[in-house]
Amino acid sequence: LLMLTFFIAEQGRAQTYHRTSQGIKSTVQGINIDISFFSPVTVRILKSPDGWKYTKESLSVIGQPEKVKLSVSSKGGILTIKSHQLTVHLNEETGQITFASSDGKSLLQEQNKGARFDDFNDAGTKTFSVYQSFTLEKDEAIYGLGQLQNGKMSQRNQTKRLIQDNLEDVIPFFQSVKGYGLFWDNYSPTIFKDNQEETSFLSEVGDCIDFYFLYGENADGVVDQMRYLTGQVPMFPLWTYGFWQSRERYKSQKEIVGVVQKYRELGVPLDGIIQDWRYWGSNYRGNAMDFGN
């Protein structure tokens, strides 16, 4: 009887998911979960409320999923999806996802019941504010979030609103000294928070939770996977790596040309000079100060 009960329970758990070409889909605690391997080391996680219909076309991801050899097994309420380089565990009772290397080293885990969907009215369209929390190690340094003006290297222990700004370019992405990266694929105003209790993303608008886990083993490997997802960044031409002259602004074309001439007169190499905001003028046409070339 005990053996039969165990068999039925295990069968019940097994029926909570089904295989897809890239991984599995499951519904746990009223949340649809889609775990899809884009490569042996890159996994996409999609979550949405059960019954919610939506279409998500990324504005950032251009990489196409590779055909990845996977093994899927279920034991003790834990569903395990493995490539030859990365292991993903799904708790079939709580929906918690954890990521580990192929040799079993823990990399990152979601918090238990760490996904949340709050109703949001987006200019008359029903959608959600979406939230996902993770647990990082106490002394785990992370880098990224874009080009910020906060003077920090590691982006731990802060709350940061990620929105494009005149002085800051934000990217909802970080990479860890443990050799993985996390890309939160959402373009609405987003709160990144890290404290002793959690590391989380909260986006104002989203039909789903959508993020990518990238395991590169080191920083270069993570960047390589991010390029695979979002495209190569072209190198600047050689001359841009030389000496540049910059100041708050120049008042006229005569002034800026005079500075260049003085550099030439002194024999000081100059590869670029920056004319900042004064050229804008009082309307959209720009070129307000006779930069006539």
Where are these regions (language model features)?
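Aromatic- and carboxylate-enriched substrate-binding clefts and catalytic-loop regions
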Residues: 269-293
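A low-complexity, Ser/Thr/Gly/Pro-enriched, surface-exposed linker/loop concept
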Residues: 17, 21, 36-79, 116-120
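Catalytic and substrate-binding clefts that recognize carbohydrates or anionic sugar/phosphate headgroups
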Residues: 74-238, 247-248, 253, 258-267
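Short, surface-exposed charged micro-motifs
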Residues: 16, 32-34, 71, 87-89, ...
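Short N-terminal segments immediately surrounding and downstream of signal-peptide cleavage
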Residues: 15-29
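Bacterial Sec-dependent N-terminal signal peptides
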Residues: 1-16
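Structural preference for beta-strand elements that scaffold enzyme active sites
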Residues: 240-242, 272
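Aromatic/His-enriched, Gly/Pro-containing loop or helix-boundary segments
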Residues: 57-84, 151, 159, 284-293
